[in-house]
Amino acid sequence: MRFTILVLLMLVVISIISLEVSSASWQAYNDCVYEKGVQFLKKNVTTFGLGRGNPFPEEGNLLQFKDGKDTGVVVSFVEHKSQGNTINWAKDGATFNDGSDAFKVFNDIVDAGGNMSYNDGPKWHLDLIISGLDPQALYTFVGTVNLKGGAGYKERITNWKVLEADGFEYACSVDAHKIGDGQVEFSTGENSEGLVAKWTDIGPGKDGKFIIRTGHGIGEKKGGIKGAHEYKGYAAGMFMLMYQGPRAVNPSRDRISTIWGRLKRDVKIH
């Protein structure tokens, strides 16, 4: 009898673990600047963007790359202007070096060409608002851009921030300039080395939202890259969002022990 109960309890534990694992992750990709007939566009990659000349919507729902299912996640671009020209939707050709971080994430999925540029003065920024998220789940974000302008464009720096998130882990490229766990900079005027802004284990706020903010470099005095241009830096090029799964209250091993102990207590197995 006890053996039968033990077997049943083990099956219950396995079922609970399997149920948690079955919450399969998904990935969604967005090409912020897609030029029809010139660049490739993979099926289920969205093309939301912003800027002068942009023919696509500034907001919409992301699709699961694998099967095209609607993720229910809404992305929207909001520009905070400074002066002069606003962000331009530019179709410059670009690539990333083989084996680079950007290459590993985006190669053969999102065309590296194109960028969303900058305003003609300091203090502009672009918010990528990601909403419709599950507050009880975790996500990964990866973003990058490359004008591929050569050495003369290295001073054109992009500052990336993650905002309004309930926790995250810094996972940006090793050679990127880390300012803090939620802030990083690297050159986007020349980024053939394929640096990326990446955060994992992002917990959305209670409103199911977090924001990725891009702008020009903040300057050396504020902890940014030395010699960064006063206002030139590229706002966006492409990004990937991944659903990791539900937040875990405890690590898996502790969870199994807790479930097993509770079941033993409830049925008084000795």
Predicted region positions:
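Contiguous ligand/interfacial binding patches
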Residues: 24-46, 146-245
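Surface-exposed, low-complexity/disordered Ser/Thr/Gly/Pro/Asn-rich loops and linkers
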Residues: 65-131
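A short beta-strand element within beta-rich, extracytoplasmic domains
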Residues: 135-150
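Residue-level detector of buried hydrophobic side-chain packing
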Residues: 139-143, 239, 263
